[in-house]
């Protein structure tokens, strides 16, 4: 009986240690992803100065929120006077729910890897200098509610993959250089037209069966 109890205690201790190691590995991976973002940014106001890669747990860093399992769920860097570009490593933050990087001077493209953020609820990248196309991979974000990409320099069509996100309530892509037609399917049926304004080559709303969505879009 004593030996049996000892084996149970050893098994329980082993399980606890395994879970702790898994969480430590996750924290390291998320910390590496955030540090990659820090390296890509110019930060004159030292907003991300606390993002020290020698600290194992990124939950101690300013502007980073974690859940009870020490997994990164929110990144708040809106209106922080940041410039630079986004990095594909952000796609490793699989528990992230809110990515807030609005009102900065961030340039370059939106990484397609953001489509891996399966828990994402809000993607706020408005008022930056982002270029390139809206990644079709964002259509994989099945929990997304808010998508605000307005006031950038994005080009190309609005990806039709976004029309299958049933949770999507707010889409704003105004003030870009998008082309093609405005979708009317799925959640886009209820998006106000002003959220598509100031895209000189964007036409719509789309006439289903009559107009190609990439009309006038090269």
UniProtKB/Swiss-Prot annotation:
First and last residue of the signal peptide: 1-27
Domain of life of the source: Eukaryota
GO biological process per UniProt: defense response
Source organism of this protein record: Arabidopsis thaliana
UniProt keyword list: Leucine-rich repeat, Plant defense, Repeat, Signal
InterPro entries: LRR_dom_sf, LRR_N_plant-typ, LRR_R13L4/SHOC2-like
Lineage start: Eukaryota, Viridiplantae, Streptophyta, Embryophyta, Tracheophyta
Protein name: Leucine-rich repeat protein 2
Name of the gene encoding the protein in the UniProt record: LRR2
Transmembrane segments: none
LRR repeats: 69-93, 94-117, 119-141, 142-165, 167-190
Residues in coiled coil: none
Function field: Probably involved in plant defense response.
PANTHER family: SOMATIC EMBRYOGENESIS RECEPTOR KINASE 1
A Pfam family annotated for this UniProt entry: LRRNT_2
């Amino acid at each position: 009986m004593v030996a049996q109890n000892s084996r149970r205690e050893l098994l329980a201790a082993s399980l606890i240690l395994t879970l702790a190691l898994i969480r430590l590995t996750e924290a390291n991976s998320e910390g590496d992803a955030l540090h990659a973002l820090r390296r890509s940014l110019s930060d004159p106001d030292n907003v991300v100065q606390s993002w020290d890669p020698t600290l194992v747990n990124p939950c101690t860093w300013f502007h980073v929120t974690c859940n009870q399992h020490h997994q990164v769920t929110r990144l708040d860097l809106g209106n922080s006077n940041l410039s630079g570009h986004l990095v594909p490593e952000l796609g490793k933050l699989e528990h992230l729910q809110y990515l807030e990087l609005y009102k900065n001077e961030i340039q370059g493209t939106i990484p397609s890897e953001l489509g891996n953020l399966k828990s994402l609820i809000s993607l706020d990248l408005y008022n930056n200098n982002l270029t390139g196309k809206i990644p079709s991979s964002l259509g994989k974000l099945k929990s997304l509610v808010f998508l605000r990409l307005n006031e950038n320099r994005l080009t190309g069509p609005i990806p039709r993959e976004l029309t299958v996100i049933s949770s999507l309530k707010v889409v704003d892509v105004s003030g870009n250089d998008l082309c093609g037609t405005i979708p009317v399917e799925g959640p886009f049926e209820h998006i106000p037209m002003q959220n598509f304004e100031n895209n000189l080559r964007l036409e719509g709303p789309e006439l289903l069966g009559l107009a190609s969505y990439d009309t006038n879009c090269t």
